[in-house]
Amino acid sequence: MSIEVFNESGYDGVNEEALIDVAQFALMRMDIHPAADMTISIVDEPTIEDLHVRWLNLEGPTDVMSFPMDELTPGSGRPDADAPGPAMLGDIVLCPAFAERQAHRAGHGLGHELSLLTVHGILHLLGYDHVAPEEERRMFALQNDILADWYTDLEERGVSYGPKPTGPGAFPTAADREALDQDMIKSTVGGMLAEPTDRDKS
């Protein structure tokens, strides 16, 4: 399983090793075939804003976007599954500048926020969505389970990319995230989001 990270954001504080680790864990947890590949692109706000408008017709920057390619479904890595051969899952695009402000409002650090967004993006690559309320609840519950299990797995391996956050925004429900989205929108001043203070980049 190959996961490539392309950091074109010029943003400090992005732990690429952690992103690869959580992505590999999520794909294994979803039983994705080990021959599958994906990329993680890390970009600045103007770039993701352009993608947001061009692909979703939504103004303003965002935290994560997913661009699926080959269709792989959960369970494709099981011994009894048909062997699909090498496949390119697609690309996840992350914006750390936006994500850091979002993390500040949620009460945790950039590292955890990017890990959460990586899992979220992978679930989108695998066909999960949150348009309908029930789908949204199911997707966010799965996202939180994967993320929590990843922290447990890190502890068992003796690896740490920062402490596991315990605040209410660390493993959000769909309703929690919707409230955060609204808070981010309200914080927009003159087209730019207000910068947080005293940020934890772990």
UniProtKB/Swiss-Prot annotation:
Q: How are cofactors bound according to the entry's free-text note?
A: Binds 1 zinc ion.
Q: Which GO terms describe its molecular function?
A: metalloendopeptidase activity; RNA endonuclease activity; zinc ion binding
Q: Name one GO cellular component term.
A: cytoplasm
Pfam families documented for this protein: YbeY
Output the superkingdom of the source species.
Bacteria
Tell me the keywords, alphabetical order.
Cytoplasm, Endonuclease, Hydrolase, Metal-binding, Nuclease, Ribosome biogenesis, rRNA processing, Zinc
Where along this sequence does the record place binding of Zn(2+)? 120, 124, 130
Biological process terms in GO annotation: rRNA processing
- Cofactors named for this entry: Zn(2+)
Which EC class is the enzyme in?
hydrolase
| Record field: transmembrane | none
EC code(s) of this entry? 3.1.-.-
In the UniProt record, does the keyword Signal occur?
Answer: no
Family matches, as HAMAP family: Endoribonucl_YbeY
Q: Which PANTHER family match?
A: ENDORIBONUCLEASE YBEY, CHLOROPLASTIC (PTHR46986:SF1)
Per the record, the similarity remark reads: Belongs to the endoribonuclease YbeY family.
Instruction: Briefly state the protein's biological role.
Output: Single strand-specific metallo-endoribonuclease involved in late-stage 70S ribosome quality control and in maturation of the 3' terminus of the 16S rRNA.
Could you tell me what this protein is called? Endoribonuclease YbeY
